[in-house]
Amino acid sequence: MRVPYETMLAEFERVLKKYGFSAERAHEAAEIFAQNSLAGVFSHGLNRFPRVVEYLRKGEIDPAAEAVCTASFGAMERWDGQRGFGPLNARHAMARAVELAHQFGIGMVALGNNNHWMRGGTYGWQAADAGCIGICWSNTCPNMPAWGAKDSRIGNNPLILAVPRASGEHIMVDCALSQFSYGKLETLRLAGKQLPVAGGYDENGQLTTDPAAIEKTCRMVPIGYWKGSGLSILLDMIGTILTGANSVAKVGTFGDEVGLTQIMIAIDPAKFQSADLTDAVIDAIAADVAASEPAEPGREVRCPGMGEHRSRKENMELGIPVAEEKWAEVLAM
């Protein structure tokens, strides 16, 4: 089943207005969810929307709260998200980081006490659309064991790196520090599919490709094993230092995944060189990667983010594929 983009956008907007968003903020927030689905990231679009509505019902998200700057020093600012709607606070924080980058060459906003930002790639792409290199990350609740541990005490803290192209076909890595995000596990489970490689442990402590088994144990495998574990810990430390807000351990005491710590960094390469030269560098590296001999005959080797352009085009033309039970849930709200 496919749903037109404008139809999905309108339904998200309708529901958000019902739960206290102003017309302007409802449209901007709905656009983030619809754009994520358009890009093929259903785990942080349609599939995640009902959970956000549940947080609104429970009062975990204040639809009217907006992030405020609490400290500023040159190219750096510290913001308090005031437990508002995560994606809007994150979008505004990255917009400010871009402003600072255009002024100073680099800009950073440390956003504390925010709620889930949905898809982190939204903000990397946002920076790239403004001609900037985007770097951002968020911590999470404790949802992954540190390497060598059984119990979950670290987060699968998503990390995003994006580089701009004048064409808009940016190159971007958007990855949780677990082998798969929980959203991806849900998407594959709903589709009745297994993971392509082991992503976590089952109740017997065995590596498994069954998404439902991993969701049950909450024992995911960090990317790169000990390397992903270490990266998760350091991102949490850096973010908590810069925001003065909540660590993964502290978030774990809140009951729900709220009050998160997020870092937005934008770098303006135009301070060093022209956009044409930046494009030439990116194009040369991308072409070299694409010239790789594929491990499987006929399979394309490409840079991260390039599949998103195709998904956007196809889904805008044909409609966005949806899990029917999730779409029905939204229509009933």
Task: Report the location of each language-model feature.
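N-terminal nucleophile
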Residues: 154, 158-161, 176, 230-246, ...
